[in-house]
Amino acid sequence: FNINENTTFILISLKKDLKDSDIENLGGEFYNFIKKNSFKNISIITGSAQNKPGMDFIGHFVHGLKLKSYEFNIYKSKKVKNDITINLVGKQNTSFTKNKLKFKALEEGTFFTRDLVSEPGNVLHPDEYAKRLTQLRKYGLKVTVYDKKKLKKLGFNALLGVGQGSIRGSYLVTIEWKGNKSKSNPLAFVGKGVCFDTGGYSLKPARFMEDMTYDMAGSAAVV
């Protein structure tokens, strides 16, 4: 990389026994710094920290930086572009190469979850939520959508009772991944996916209403 009079050097001093989450938090703080100072081209020079066996400092650092860069701005008429180029300078260890795809998948999954949680209730209603989850089939997942008729047949009366106050229908979505051929018992994750509806009655005080749109965050996290 080229060094000129406009080059800014940032030195990061690391403490011993860093956890992966510490490195990711550091990457997030670094993103705040470069955004505040409008830096557009970043070169990260790897040092001794990256050379430790089994430690992927750069991978976790950039992962934290990318997670911090998330913005939900699809409804803004004027979108501020944060185009930042990151160059990695130096030899990367095998951990970095091996983890690149894993971090990419984690980032895409996290951003998908954040998009779901950030959508307003008049956009992400139950049928729209179920529709978006069916898109996961392209990754080889088995996605099954149970509508009102199927839920009634299966005896999901409590779930249907909650949805009676809405003009929209209720759904239950199951997502299955059978990537392990082991005969051991499968793991099941259950997330609450109650979508906020602006109609009907609410027993909650007004000051708690604005957070109701996050009532489906549990299911979004599971997804």
Task: Go through the PLM ranges and name each one.
Residues 133, 187-189, 202-223:
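Alpha-helical metal-binding/catalytic segments enriched in His/Glu/Asp
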Residues 1-193:
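Short amphipathic alpha-helical segment within the helicase RecA-like ATPase core
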